[in-house]
C-alpha cells in the first residue's frame, strides 16, 4: 500500500469516527432523548406567559372589584375637597388607588364604598347620630370625583351601563354603603339613597343595628342573634323590591344564614374570604358558601392580610388569596366567586397585592394554579354582573305587585322631645312652647 493510499484510508477512518460522534450528539440533543425534567421545563409556560394571558382576558372582560374605600381616604385627608389639585387622582396618591394604577391594574368597574364609621362609643340604636349626614356627604364627594374625571370614569346604576362603560374604555363606577347605621335604620332612607345611586348596602358594619347582628359583636363574646325579626326581614324584602344588592360582608354567621333563608334575590359578599382557609369571623363558613350557591349569589374575595391569614398575617401573600379563591370555587363553584380587595380600607395587604395595579398578577397566579379562561372571566366580572342583572330582573317583577315597605323598628321613638324648654312670650306672659301634653310633637 502506498503512503498516499494509507493516508487516505486513515482520513476516511477518522471522518467516519467524527460522523459517528456527531450523530450521537444529535441524538442526545433531540427532544425524544431529553430527560423528562428538561422536557417539562421546556414545555411549561413561564410566569410572563400567564401574565400575558391575564392581560388578554382583562382586555375583553371587565374586572369589577366589590369594595374600595377611596372615598373615605379622601374624607380623612382633604375633608372631601377634591378641586384645585387637592386630590391629584391622575397622579400617584399616597394610598392604594389612583387613575394611573387603576389603568395599570386593568380595572373595568369599581364599587366605591361611601363608608362612614359606626358611632364611637356605641350608642343605642335609636339615638340620633351624624351617620346619615356623613353618608350623604360621601355620596356627594364620590359622584363629584367621578364627574371630575369623566374622561376615565363613568357613573353607573345598572349592570348594562357597566358593560357599556367598559366597551367605551371607561372604568364603570358604582356606589355601596357599608352598614345599616348609615341609613338611620330607616326603610325610607333606604329608598332615598337608592334614588341617589347607591346599589348595595352592607347589612351591618362593625356594630349591630336595627336590622341585624354584626360579626364584631360575636367576636366580643356576645350572642349571635342573627337577622333581627321582624324588621331585619322587612329590610331584606325591601332591598329586593328596590333592586338593591344585599351585601353580607361584616355580618355574623347567623345573620348570613337568616338572610339567605328570606332573600328573594341573589346576595353578595362584597369583601369576604373563606372561613375554612382562615378562621376569622369576617370570612364565610362552608355551610354558608353552599347556600350562596343555591341562592345564585357571589362571594368576592378580600385581600386584607389578617382576614386571609389569621394565624400569621405577615406571612400572607398573593398565593394566600389564590387559596381562598380556589376554596370558594371548590365549595360553591366558579359561578359564585369574585374579587373585593378592600383597597384603601386597610393598611395590611398581602405581598404581591400592594395596590390596585396588581390585579393582573393575581389573575396570572389563578391561571397558573389551573383555572380555565372561562373560569377566570367569571371570577373577575361575569359573576357579579350576572348577580346584579338577576337582582334587577326580580325587582322589576316585585314592583308590579308590591308597594314601598312601611315597616319600622319597634323600638323607635316617634315623638322625640326637645332637649331644652323653649319659651315664647305671648301677650306679655311666659308660655311654655313645649308642654308635657304635646311632648314637642309639632313643627310650627
From Swiss-Prot:
InterPro entries for the chain: Dipep_AS, Metal_Hydrolase, Pept_M19
Keyword Glycoprotein: yes
N-terminal signal peptide: 1-34
UniProt-listed Enzyme Commission number(s): 3.4.13.19
Protein keywords: Dipeptidase, Disulfide bond, Glycoprotein, Hydrolase, Metal-binding, Metalloprotease, Protease, Signal, Zinc
Glycosylation, residue list: 413
Residues noted as binding Zn(2+) 1 in the record, renumbered to the chain: 67, 69, 178
Binding site for substrate: 205, 282, 342
Residue pairs linked by disulfide bridges in the UniProt entry: 118-207
Record-given protein name: Putative dipeptidase CPC735_015490
Protein source organism: Coccidioides posadasii (strain C735)
